[in-house]
UniProtKB/Swiss-Prot annotation:
Sequence positions that bind CoA: 190-193, 313, 527
Lineage, broadest ranks: Bacteria, Pseudomonadati, Spirochaetota, Spirochaetia, Leptospirales
Family the entry assigns: Belongs to the ATP-dependent AMP-binding enzyme family.
Function text: Catalyzes the conversion of acetate into acetyl-CoA (AcCoA), an essential intermediate at the junction of anabolic and catabolic pathways. AcsA undergoes a two-step reaction. In the first half reaction, AcsA combines acetate with ATP to form acetyl-adenylate (AcAMP) intermediate. In the second half reaction, it can then transfer the acetyl group from AcAMP to the sulfhydryl group of CoA, forming the product AcCoA.
Transmembrane regions: none
InterPro entries: Ac_CoA_lig (IPR011904), ACAS_N (IPR032387), AMP-bd_C (IPR025110), AMP-bd_C_sf (IPR045851), AMP-binding_CS (IPR020845), AMP-dep_synth/lig_dom (IPR000873), ANL_N_sf (IPR042099)
Protein name in UniProt: Acetyl-coenzyme A synthetase
Catalytic activity annotation: acetate + ATP + CoA = acetyl-CoA + AMP + diphosphate
Ligand binding (ATP): 389-391, 413-418, 504, 519, 530
Record SUPFAM superfamilies: Acetyl-CoA synthetase-like (SSF56801)
Single GO MF annotation: AMP binding
């Protein structure tokens, strides 16, 4: 392995940080040794209508967990009501930036409160009650945040479906969660192009076995040509919310801490969507506490998480974490490349963003564009950077740190999952020294362990690798797969008894820092040696010609598995044998000869989901010469990428 660099927080950041290293160590110790005491104290960060009867009740072996049972609270009350009787009433809650740079809007806490109350009453008027599901299929506009907060106000369970998903993907989610009502828009904009939404809902409902009686439509594009309207089912949002007879106040429903809050679907390996179910009290406490410490939030900060609310990052760190802390949260409808590759930097400059949280995929794409766009903008307001979604390779980390953060902004490289609800392993800026590429140390209450394939904990000192599991419950963890308790147990608790299995592999270094090596099915077993795909990818992108790389295993006659690398080069770089040799050499240098790629496949681009994750399942099949039965590809941003890779592979074979 290359020598690890340690980056210390600056003296100034350290001085003003929300937590010190000493406090982190003592609080972490308490959170593991006495979780009941620790979480009872931290739960006071929220406003409760009634105190719980017991902090924690669990049987991890049988996947049973309850936090704050009997405690009563309401999420929208914690995000809105408790702020509007304070000076936060007129503070910006949501700063909305449209796809087109000419469109923007600022909503104060009172603005959001007023709109949420009115829309909650609309939902009630159309028969939505506590426990009913509301499916939300909207672009990144303020009404999306307003809708989910209105659901929480009346105790309805929201299920947000990313606006880029197809009618088929939408239908499968409708069939699974059986919504009482759907909220959508006439359409949306993404990268200057219109996107279909209402039409997709119409198609999905036509094919669905569910009889959804009400569809509420937000006017976003104003383009009604081709819009099919079903009287008695379809209603305009703006007409309903501006009804003069609508009460301006909706009393927040008193919810048990364990009442369901939302369902969020993730891709399952079987192709059937997996509805991750989160509950009210533990989830809200998890996102509230992590937001405060991980992002070192201050009252005057402007914070921007670039994620879509269709993904868990948008739920936790665009809406619920920031608003429950009384922060100002930027909400962006567009893409980083429109109208040009300087758009992210424009938004930071325009709003004086202090904290910026984005994905390595975006960082690598912007890195590929060079410095021109960055140098034209003023990024001096930034004081903290974050990364989410996948491990960030050290080269991208260094670029982010030096070019965007000007070597003064710590980077929080956060590891967590849709299933965990909130950040699990991370640096705490100002307290914990960072190592580029490492997710760092566990957050309070999180007890990660590495286990071998027989389920035995690996407790050796020094550097070790294994399957990343969590040993004990944490408040924001998922409570089930919606409507399928067997699948919940089988997926997360059956492989290693008594542990929550994350599905990821990791190594722990001599300092206790965790390095995520990729999904366990992304671990390649070469001649009995376990090679993490993320490690090989990191080595490949150290070469200045490489923009991005994805590495998978494929059947090898001698080694069992060989290493197959898909490599995308930067603009203007020629692909040739000389570059191939350089790439093999750099992998040998950084990891060792055992990790040298057997095949380098030049890829103009990689197949990604709309949230930016590389679909490795498809890459593995292509590498193995399996071109049929690629499984569910409905989440792909650009299906033509797959076709091109298959054509290239066929040529390579012939």
């Amino acid at each position: 392995m290359a020598k690890e660099r340690i980056v210390l927080p600056s003296a100034e950041f350290k001085k003003n940080s929300n937590i010190t290293l000493k406090d982190y160590k003592s609080l972490y110790k308490e959170s593991i040794e006495n979780p009941n005491k620790f979480w009872a104290k931290e739960a006071n960060r929220l406003t409760w209508f009634k105190k719980w009867t017991k902090v924690l009740n669990h049987d991890f072996k049988n996947a049973k967990v309850e936090w704050f049972k009997g405690g009563k609270l309401n999420v929208s009350y914690n995000c809105l009501d408790r702020h509007i009787s304070t000076p936060l009433k007129n503070k910006a809650a949501l700063i909305w930036e449209g796809d087109n740079p000419s469109e923007s809007k600022v909503l104060t806490y009172y603005d959001v409160y007023r709109e949420v109350n009115r829309f909650a009453n609309v939902l009630k008027k159309y028969g939505v009650k506590k426990g009913d599901r509301v499916l939300v299929y909207l672009p990144m506009i303020p009404e999306l945040a307003i809708t989910i907060l209105a659901c929480t106000r009346i105790g309805a369970i929201h299920s947000v479906v990313f606006g880029g998903f197809s009618p088929e993907a939408l239908q499968s989610r409708i069939d699974d969660c059986k919504p009482k009502l759907i909220v959508t828009a006439d359409g949306g904009f993404r990268g200057g192009k219109p996107i279909e939404l209402k039409r997709n809902v119409d198609i999905a409902l036509e094919k669905s076995k569910e009889d959804v009686k009400t569809v509420i439509v937000v006017r976003r594009t104003g383009n009604e040509s081709g819009l099919v309207w079903k009287d008695g089912r379809d209603y305009w949002y703006h007409f309903l919310i501006s009804d003069p007879d609508l009460s301006p106040y909706c009393k927040p429903e008193s919810m048990d801490a364990e009442d369901p809050l939302f369902i969020l679907y993730t891709s399952g390996s079987t192709g059937k969507p997996k509805g991750v179910l989160h509950t009210t009290g533990g989830y809200l406490l998890g996102v509230n506490l992590t937001f405060h410490y991980v992002f070192d939030i201050k009252p005057e900060d402007t914070y921007w998480c670039t994620a879509d609310i269709g993904w868990v990052t948008g739920h936790s760190y665009l809406v619920y974490g920031p608003l429950s802390n009384g922060a100002s949260s930027v909400m962006f409808e567009g893409v980083p490349s429109y109208p040009d590759a300087g758009r992210f930097w424009d938004v930071i400059d325009k709003y004086g963003v202090n904290i910026f949280y984005t994905a390595p995929t975006a960082i690598r794409a912007l890195m590929r564009e060079g410095l021109t766009h960055v140098q034209k903008r003023n990024l001096s307001s930034l004081r903290l950077l974050g990364s989410v979604g996948e491990p960030i390779n050290p080269e991208a980390w260094e670029w982010y740190f030096k070019i965007i953060g000007k070597e003064k902004c710590p980077i929080v490289d956060t590891w967590w999952q849709t299933e965990t609800g909130s950040i699990m392993i991370t640096a705490l800026p100002g307290a914990i020294p960072q190592k580029p590429g490492s997710a760092t140390l566990p957050f309070f209450g999180v007890q990660p362990v590495l286990v071998d394939n027989d389920g035995k904990e690996i407790n050796d000192k020094g550097e070790v690798s294994g399957n990343l599991c969590i040993k004990s419950p944490w408040p924001s963890m998922m409570r089930g797969v919606y409507g399928d308790s067997k699948r919940f147990f089988d997926t997360y608790f059956s492989q290693f008894k008594g542990y929550y299995f994350t599905g990821d592999g990791a190594r722990r270094d001599k300092d206790g820092y965790y390095w995520i090596t990729g999904r366990v099915d992304d671990v390649i077993n070469v001649s009995g040696h376990r090679i993490g795909s993320a490690e090989v990818e990191s080595a490949l992108v150290e070469n200045r010609s490489v923009a991005e790389a994805a590495v998978v295993g494929f059947p090898h006659d001698i080694k069992g598995q060989g290493i197959y690398a898909y490599v995308t080069v930067k603009e203007g770089i020629a692909t040739n044998d000389t570059l191939k040799k350089e790439l093999v050499a750099i992998v040998e240098k950084v990891i060792g000869k055992i990790a040298r790629p057997d095949v380098i496949h030049w890829a103009p681009s990689l197949p990604k989901t709309r949230s930016g994750k590389i679909m490795r399942r498809i890459l593995r099949k292509i590498a193995s010469g399996e071109f049929e039965g690629l499984g569910d590809t409905s989440t792909l941003a650009d299906p033509s990428v797959v076709q091109k890779l298959i054509e290239d592979k066929r040529k390579f074979h012939s």
